[in-house]
Amino acid sequence: MAASSLWGPAVAGGGESSESEDDGWEIGYLDRAPQKFTAPLPAEEKNEMFKKALTTGDTSLVEELLNAGISVDSSFRYGWTPLMFAASIANVNLVRVLLNRGANASFEKDKQTVLMTACSARGSQEQIIKCVELLLSRNADPNVACRRQMTPIMYAARGGHPQVVALLVAHGAEVNAQDENGYTALTWAAYQGHKNVILKLLELGANKMLQTKDGKTPSEIANRNKHPEIFSLLSLTLNPLEGKIQQLTKEETICKMLATDCDKEKDNLFSSYTAFGELDLFLHGLGLEHMTDLLKERDISLRHLMTMKKDEFLKNGITNKDQQKILSALKELMVEEIKFGELPEVAKLEISGDEFLNFLLKLNKQCGHLITAVQNIITELPVNSHKIVLEWASPRNFTSVCEELVTNVEGLSEEVCRLKDLIQKLQNERESDPTHIPLVEEVSPWKSRLLKRTAVTVCGFGILLGICKLMFQRKLL
């Protein structure tokens, strides 16, 4: 983080800064042009001039002061060296000059290394890549961890820099390292919603099943932080990208990772959550990028693809092999239907506890999927009515259906609450029955918590539909 106003150096995540504003670093501040000195200066004045030269990026003056005896590894406030400051603002020229003059690329302060600072720097990805590459070329260790056990690749992933991530892995960074909370680079990227970093990490062999200390996978972290694209991608069982470059040499890996299409990078950076954005992501996750142009030419959206029959696949030129990949992935994403006709007849009292629990689990899962579906619809609806391209029916029709949905969900909520009360009553009666011998599994309260969670989920779905209805009306005004 940076100190207040224009004062103080940037500190990588995991580092600490002082409360003092009198630190001598004036980032971006220039009240006068740097002046070259012709006569010997006192040490204190030389140090001040050195700081000004660093903050203004005056590499010529920096070299002149180094020639005059200033140490290249001078320690200023916070214990930072000039190289760490230059890395924090991704000033490539300064980093190069300081390294060429012998600056320590492996310097660390309170377990925070120069490489970590560079990976979390302020600046463009191109500048950060060059700084990181310079540091790695001077044997900076990409696997050293800070006090929070975060490594440089985690900082790069959290900052949204896929090429920096690839460069670090090419130089030996452990892609599945975990910090003190069990977060990996993939988890950090999922937390921040960096799609390009997610795709790059999967290609580099990141394990998407590693859990945090509280038992969350990257996909669950993405879902919790409202990143539906990332959640869908990481929820796929298949991972055709995994380990694609594991057999390449370091040089081949660097060339492959850094040779990216600038236009594509720009499009991905500014793309919104659109139907074709979903389609691109879905195909990329299955290794079917070659189908993207074909489907776009035929104006086939992801929603259309998900409902295709076999004859439609063939008609649109999708091979059997590709069909199998798509169908397998869709099977994982589809909501599991509850076949109510096959459920045991409760009235005959022949239903087993396991069967009834299975029913409740399926019902709860369905409600969760329905909530996610409505959230996605809310996200995709245009803000203003003039942005709707195709002709829609009267908005009153949609509002009417939403009202019916709200009514039905409220009814479902009431019935689930009645069911919960009934089960609670049965449970209380059994516990008070002196002839009843409780089973070991009944001692655990997790089943009753599941029922409560189901009731809360249904209630939440009702509230969500109400919000959906209000937002829908507002967007069509």
From Swiss-Prot:
ANK repeats: 45-74, 78-107, 110-144, 148-177, 181-210, 214-243
UniProt keywords, alphabetically: ANK repeat, Cytoplasm, Developmental protein, Differentiation, Meiosis, Phosphoprotein, Repeat, RNA-mediated gene silencing, Spermatogenesis
Cellular component per GO, a single term: pi-body
Superkingdom in the source lineage: Eukaryota
Main location: cytoplasm
Subcellular location: Cytoplasm
GO biological process: cell differentiation; male meiotic nuclear division; regulatory ncRNA-mediated gene silencing; spermatogenesis; transposable element silencing
The keyword Cytoplasm appears for this protein: yes
Quaternary structure, from the entry: Interacts with DDX4, PIWIL1, RANBP9 and TDRD1.
Function: Plays a central role during spermatogenesis by repressing transposable elements and preventing their mobilization, which is essential for the germline integrity. Acts via the piRNA metabolic process, which mediates the repression of transposable elements during meiosis by forming complexes composed of piRNAs and Piwi proteins and governs the methylation and subsequent repression of transposons. Its association with pi-bodies suggests a participation in the primary piRNAs metabolic process.
Listed name of the protein: Ankyrin repeat, SAM and basic leucine zipper domain-containing protein 1
Species of the source: Echinops telfairi (Lesser hedgehog tenrec)
Species classification: Eukaryota, Metazoa, Chordata, Craniata, Vertebrata
